[in-house]
Design a protein with these regions (language model features):
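A short glycine-/small-residue-rich loop at the edge of a beta-strand within enzyme catalytic domains
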Residues: 31-32, 63, 67-71
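Post-HEXXH active-site segment of zinc metalloproteases
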Residues: 28-58, 95-98
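Short amphipathic alpha-helical segments at helix-loop
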Residues: 4-5, 61-65, 111
Length: 152
């Protein structure tokens, strides 16, 4: 995967900016908190129905950890375009990263209820994000994200 990823500078920059987006939005801490809450709920439900408490906790933790996952990915993608623009990258090239990703990782084309949006959803969203950022730049403004986190 790394060879195609590093085909041009924007691919590596996209991944890096995306991960910075997760960090800036505190997604790791949120996932840990969600997993802990899920584990507690799983434990209580497991005890209530007579299931193995450890298995119930594991199931609850997994469900908790993946809650909001697609929202987190969308937030990180959104912020990544701002990070790229502020870093001087040509953001118009960013959406095509997901086209290449779909070719190299075909099972990413469909989200299938997973933890990440499909590559086609990402491509479309990124085009919207690029337009939003470019509109700010065209007005002579410093790009500033216009969103509120999905949960506070």
């Amino acid at each position: 995967m790394a060879k195609w990823l590093l085909q041009d500078e924007i691919g590596a920059a996209m991944v890096f900016a995306h991960e910075l987006g997760h960090n800036a939005n505190h997604h790791v801490a949120d996932k840990i908190q969600n997993a802990n809450t899920g584990a507690l709920v799983g434990l209580l439900l497991g005890i209530a129905i007579g299931a193995n408490p450890a298995d119930a906790m594991d199931l609850g933790a997994n469900i908790g950890a993946t809650s909001y996952s697609i929202d987190y990915e969308n937030e990180a993608d959104y912020l990544s375009i701002y990070i790229l623009a502020l870093s001087g990258y040509d953001i118009s090239k960013a959406p095509n990263f997901w086209r290449r990703f779909a070719v190299e990782v075909p099972n990413s084309i469909y989200s299938g209820g997973g933890t990440h949006p499909s590559t086609s959803e990402r491509f479309i969203r990124l085009e919207t994000y690029v337009k939003e950022v470019q509109d700010q730049i065209d007005k002579g403004l410093k790009p500033v994200p216009k969103y509120k986190k999905h949960k506070e």
